[in-house]
UniProtKB/Swiss-Prot annotation:
Alphabetized GO MF terms: pseudouridine synthase activity; RNA binding; tRNA pseudouridine(13) synthase activity
Alphabetized UniProt keyword annotations: Isomerase, tRNA processing
Family matches, as PANTHER family: PSEUDOURIDYLATE SYNTHASE PUS7L, TRNA PSEUDOURIDINE SYNTHASE D
Main enzyme class: isomerase
Record organism: Methanosarcina acetivorans (strain ATCC 35395 / DSM 2834 / JCM 12185 / C2A)
Entry EC no(s): 5.4.99.27
Family designation: Belongs to the pseudouridine synthase TruD family.
Residue span, TRUD domain: 168-393
Active site: D89 (nucleophile)
Function recorded in the entry: Could be responsible for synthesis of pseudouridine from uracil-13 in transfer RNAs.
Enzymatic reactions: uridine(13) in tRNA = pseudouridine(13) in tRNA
Name used for this protein in its record: Probable tRNA pseudouridine synthase D
Length: 441
């Protein structure tokens, strides 16, 4: 069977293959908000004491940051007193834990927001934080599938069989990591690592992308050609608040391109270098698959990480596989106690040896990556020493198939699966749907 062509936007972020060679379902996601259900899995149990009130939040079609901002306003408190373990998709029905510092449970009775349900779980001496999150359960409906329910079932069974045989799907970073409409974050990160802040700033502010609205493209093109930030502010839409903030900085501080990044929120400016690391990781993972090296059987030179108390891969505990340990390591991998990894390179990353190491160094050479560049002297908060990430997303989706009541004559399927934190549902769905990520929803 001919390998299926990967959409252009995925090639731009370093993904050039599917690991399954089965037919794609096509179809689309999120026709209704309830088609995408996400439930957080945490390791917390709440008690009766402590200064943090812990709640279960169920929200429909709400952005997490927008919700916490709105909640803080109603309660008349600082947004900093509200903590979550992870941000969730906006166009979805999501359930997660949140904590609020120093507030009475009775205050929650004030909250009457459309499509929001808050349930008091108890109190704690510590806030809800990222470390509490183990993973997420997903119940996802794919609609508008052209094949009949019987054909849809056959396609799903074939893909599922492939996924189970290979132990899961490649743990790629999906388009969300790079910007869905404008996959520019990794290019900005590359320029930063190369020490070229001027190029980085201009890419972020002024590089037009085909999928953007025409007036946005024209505004960006003008600034790209003229560097007239003052004039540019007149045409840049208000929704491009980050770009506008950077241009304002450059009007007041001409040529201070690294300083222009300091006006951005910390989580955004840190994302640039992380996205570049993710791009390199995706490239290395594709090359490993193309080379015919298994993702669930270690070879000599591989670096594996081990399972933590939550049963999740812990990249801080690693070991290099040798000829003496390869069989024992593969037994651990088979039982889900060890995981093969690939690098998110930085200034202090451990690299594999043997054939996996050759692949890693070859990609770094082809991309002309300077590891020292990840130590960003001009903007130390952007620096990254690097880490390693498991190459396989162990997943066993269950599915149901039926007629699509919203699209007469079409089929639908409901997929259920669990993923560890930091992984993307779309990474699983791409193997089943095989469509352009921008057309998925």
């Amino acid at each position: 069977m001919q390998p299926m062509e990967v959409p252009e936007i995925e090639k731009q972020i370093g993904i050039n293959l599917y690991s399954t060679n089965t037919e794609g379902l096509g179809g689309r996601l999120r026709q209704e908000v309830e088609d995408f259900i996400v439930k957080e899995i945490t390791n917390r149990e709440e008690g009766k004491d402590g200064r943090y009130l812990v709640l279960e939040l169920t929200k429909r079609d709400w952005d997490t940051h927008h919700f916490t901002r709105t909640l803080a306003k109603i309660l008349q408190i600082s947004q900093k007193r509200i903590s979550v373990a992870g941000t969730k998709d906006k166009r979805a029905l999501t359930t997660q834990k949140i904590s609020i510092f120093d507030i009475d449970a009775l205050e929650i009775e004030k909250i009457h927001l459309k499509d929001v349900e808050l349930k008091v779980l108890g109190r704690s001496r510590k806030s809800v934080e990222l470390g509490d999150l183990w993973g997420n359960e997903f119940i996802i409906t794919i609609r508008d599938i052209s094949s009949s329910p019987e054909e849809t079932r056959t396609i799903l069974e074939k893909t599922n069989s492939k996924v189970l045989t290979q132990g899961g799907v490649p743990n790629f970073f999906g388009v969300q990591r790079f910007g869905s409409v404008r996959s520019v974050t990794h290019l900005v990160g590359k320029a930063i690592v190369e020490g070229n802040f001027e190029k980085a700033a201009m890419l972020y502010i002024a590089e037009p992308f085909p999928e953007e609205p025409e007036e946005t493209k024209a505004a960006r093109q003008f600034v790209k050609e003229t560097r007239d930030f003052k004039e540019g502010l007149k045409t840049y839409p208000l929704r491009l608040g980050h770009e506008r903030a950077m241009m304002n900085h450059l009007i007041s501080n001409p040529e201070d391109y690294s300083g222009a990044f300091s006006v951005l929120p910390k989580n955004l400016y840190r994302m640039f270098v992380h996205a570049y690391q993710s791009y390199i990781y995706n490239m290395i993972l594709c090359r490993r698959i193309e080379s015919g090296i298994s993702l669930n059987r270690a070879v000599e030179g591989d670096i594996v990480c081990f399972r933590n108390e939550a049963g999740l891969p812990d990249s801080s505990k690693t070991e290099k596989v040798t000829s003496e340990t390869v069989n024992a390591m593969n037994r651990l991998i088979k039982h889900g106690r060890a995981f093969i990894t690939a690098p998110l390179p930085g200034f202090n990353t451990e690299f594999a040896s043997g054939v996996p190491g050759e692949i890693e160094s070859k990609i770094l050479k082809e991309l002309r990556v300077s590891l020292e560049g990840f130590n960003v002297e001009e903007f130390p908060e952007m620096s990254s020493k690097g880490t390693r990430r498991e190459v396989l997303l162990q997943v066993e989706p269950k599915f149901e198939v039926g007629e699509d009541e919203l699209n007469p004559g079409k089929s639908k399927t409901v997929l259920e699966f669990m993923l560890p934190k930091g992984s993307y549902a779309t990474t699983v769905l791409r193997e089943y749907m095989k469509v352009d990520p921008l057309q998925m929803s």
